[in-house]
From Swiss-Prot:
This is Leucyl/phenylalanyl-tRNA--protein transferase. InterPro entries: Acyl_CoA_acyltransferase (IPR016181), Leu/Phe-tRNA_Trfase (IPR004616), Leu/Phe-tRNA_Trfase_C (IPR042203), Leu/Phe-tRNA_Trfase_N (IPR042221). The keyword Protein transport does not apply. Functions in the N-end rule pathway of protein degradation where it conjugates Leu, Phe and, less efficiently, Met from aminoacyl-tRNAs to the N-termini of proteins containing an N-terminal arginine or lysine. It is an enzyme of class 2 (transferase). One of its GO terms (cellular component) is cytoplasm. Its EC number is 2.3.2.6. Keywords: Acyltransferase, Cytoplasm, Transferase. It catalyses: N-terminal L-lysyl-[protein] + L-leucyl-tRNA(Leu) = N-terminal L-leucyl-L-lysyl-[protein] + tRNA(Leu) + H(+); N-terminal L-arginyl-[protein] + L-leucyl-tRNA(Leu) = N-terminal L-leucyl-L-arginyl-[protein] + tRNA(Leu) + H(+); L-phenylalanyl-tRNA(Phe) + an N-terminal L-alpha-aminoacyl-[protein] = an N-terminal L-phenylalanyl-L-alpha-aminoacyl-[protein] + tRNA(Phe). GO terms for biological process: protein catabolic process. Belongs to the L/F-transferase family. PANTHER family: LEUCYL/PHENYLALANYL-TRNA--PROTEIN TRANSFERASE, LEUCYL_PHENYLALANYL-TRNA--PROTEIN TRANSFERASE. It comes from Cellvibrio japonicus (strain Ueda107). It is found in: Cytoplasm.
Length: 235
């Protein structure tokens, strides 16, 4: 039986109790307060549910991650980067990026990024936990992604693309910046063919948990807010 979270506690069940099917389902209920969300990510748990349903909390096995030094840049993406087709910024329009990620897509029915999610993660953004990467073509937002940073781990949430290689460009800029800050891991949650093209690999839940304990506790020696970052444009 899946446990319901107490509204009076930020504790979660042990992730080893997560179901095998559906893979990683751990708990229901609770809320999306900044405190609970940070507590969840520190434990390798994330919310994922359809609007109107109870909040569902997940910790899948295996876990899909990208080690920054193993990020794969394809030849076509490298050409795009060298041509300087796009301009990339950080933390310039967080809510707009989330709404773009929430927009309907031809290959998916509906979206799990509700107004409730946007409101909650925007609060995390205001507190310096959640960050966005924006990809611009002229003055048009054509790609981007968002996620959370805790210690030396970035927890990716979602990305979108409205132009060729736009989201991959944003991810490449993010990875390079995280490398400069000595980030050790990018959590991608669950596998997809798209993520594997970026160099993602799968690791066990136990291995992921060990990395969480070590790397989320490392001191933050990078800015709380990223909007003043001026990314290097040469590739």
């Amino acid at each position: 039986m899946i446990p319901w979270l107490s509204p009076y506690s930020l504790e979660f069940p042990d992730v080893r109790l997560a179901l095998d099917e559906p893979n990683g389902l751990l708990a229901l209920g609770g809320d999306l307060s900044p405190e609970r969300l940070v507590s969840a990510y520190q434990r390798g748990i994330f919310p994922w549910f359809n609007p109107g349903d109870p909040i569902l909390w997940w910790s899948p096995h295996p876990r899909t991650v990208v080690f920054p030094h193993q990020h794969h840049v394809s030849r076509s993406l490298r050409k795009t980067l060298r041509k300087g087709i796009y301009r990339v910024t950080f933390d310039h329009c967080f809510a707009q990026v989330m709404r773009a990620c929430a927009a309907p897509r031809a290959y998916a029915n509906g979206t799990w990024i509700s107004e409730q999610m946007i409101s909650s993660y925007t609060r995390l953004h205001e507190q310096g936990y959640a960050h966005s990467v924006e990809v611009w073509q002229d003055e048009n937002l054509v790609g981007g992604l968002y996620g959370l940073s805790l210690g030396k781990i970035f927890f990716g949430e979602s990305m979108f693309s409205r132009a060729d290689n736009a989201s991959k460009t944003g991810f490449a800029y993010l990875v390079r910046q995280l490398q400069q800050w000595d980030f050790r891991l990018i959590d991608c949650q669950v596998a997809s063919d798209h993520l594997f093209t970026l160099g993602a690999v799968e690791i066990s839940r136990d291995e992921f948990q060990k990395m969480l304990v070590h790397f989320t506790e490392q001191p933050r020696d990078y800015p709380l807010h990223w909007h003043e970052i001026d990314p290097e444009t040469r590739w």
